[in-house]
């Protein structure tokens, strides 16, 4: 645990040094509960808080309920999820609803695991305060490639990933996320993670420190 805290502090220091005046610095803090219903089906509930404006502004609360289905053992799985997204706007809170479908393929080579994930999401915006989406729902296809390495003796899993966003209505890929970090399995029920994410948007860039906790029933 002391090693993990040192790792988090190092990430915070690096992020603070790398952010320019035009960019933003934030954080993602998440807690996830998951349960295996059968050999092929897992369900999960996640709460995530997102901070922006140099960690001074509560930007979003995301509540996600999902299920994963193993299609080919250890190599292919599908998933569906629903997210309630509460955004903290200037004078009000805005609630969006998001439907998600995913397909993930993975392969192992020694201690390395390579994976590709395709995700479709449709975000429905509450139009009570006006609609910032020109098209409602806003539909996006996301493609993510990641590599993870296993240190089996210490149950540590460093990873690196890149994810591109394609907005269907605009027919444009205008956002890419790059992430690096590590997951640490404490025991058969508890695990923690820490990482750094660079959100490369068309108009602005945001650097995030990510901290997560997972409990498996």
Residue ranges of predicted features:
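Cleavable N-terminal export/targeting peptides
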Residues: 1-22, 217
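Start-of-domain marker
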Residues: 20-79, 85-86
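Residues that define the transmembrane beta-barrel architecture of outer-membrane proteins
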Residues: 25-27, 59-63, 95-99, 135-141, ...
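Residues on the lipid-exposed face of transmembrane beta-strands in outer-membrane beta-barrel proteins
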Residues: 31-35, 65-69, 101-107, 120, ...
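Repeated loop/turn-to-beta-strand initiation elements of outer-membrane beta-barrel proteins
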Residues: 40-45, 74-78, 110-114, 153-157, ...
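Transmembrane beta-strands of outer-membrane beta-barrel pores
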Residues: 47-53, 71-73, 82-88, 107-109, ...
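Detector for outer-membrane/organellar transmembrane beta-barrel domains
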Residues: 113-161, 215
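Predominantly the C-terminal beta-signal and adjacent terminal strand-loop region
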Residues: 160, 169-217
């Amino acid at each position: 645990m002391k090693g993990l805290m040192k790792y988090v502090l190092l990430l915070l220091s690096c992020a603070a040094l790398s952010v320019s005046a035009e960019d933003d610095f934030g954080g993602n803090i998440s807690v996830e509960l998951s349960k295996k219903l059968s050999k092929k089906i897992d369900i999960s509930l996640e709460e995530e808080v997102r901070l922006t404006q140099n960690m001074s502004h509560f930007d979003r609360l995301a509540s996600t309920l999902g299920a994963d289905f193993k299609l080919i053992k250890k190599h292919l799985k599908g998933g569906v999820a629903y997210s309630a997204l509460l955004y903290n706007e200037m004078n009000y809170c805005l609630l969006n609803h998001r439907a998600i479908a995913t397909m993930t393929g993975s392969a192992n080579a020694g201690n390395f695991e390579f994976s590709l994930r395709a995700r479709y999401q449709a975000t429905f915006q509450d139009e009570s305060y006006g609609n910032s989406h020109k098209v409602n729902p806003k539909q996006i296809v996301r493609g993510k490639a990641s590599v993870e390495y296993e240190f089996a003796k210490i149950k540590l899993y460093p990873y690196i990933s890149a994810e591109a966003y394609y907005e269907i209505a605009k027919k444009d890929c205008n956002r890419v996320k790059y992430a690096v970090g590590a997951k640490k399995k404490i025991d058969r029920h508890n695990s923690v993670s820490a990482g750094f994410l660079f959100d490369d948007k068309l108009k602005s860039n945001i650097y995030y420190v990510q901290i997560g906790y997972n409990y498996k029933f």
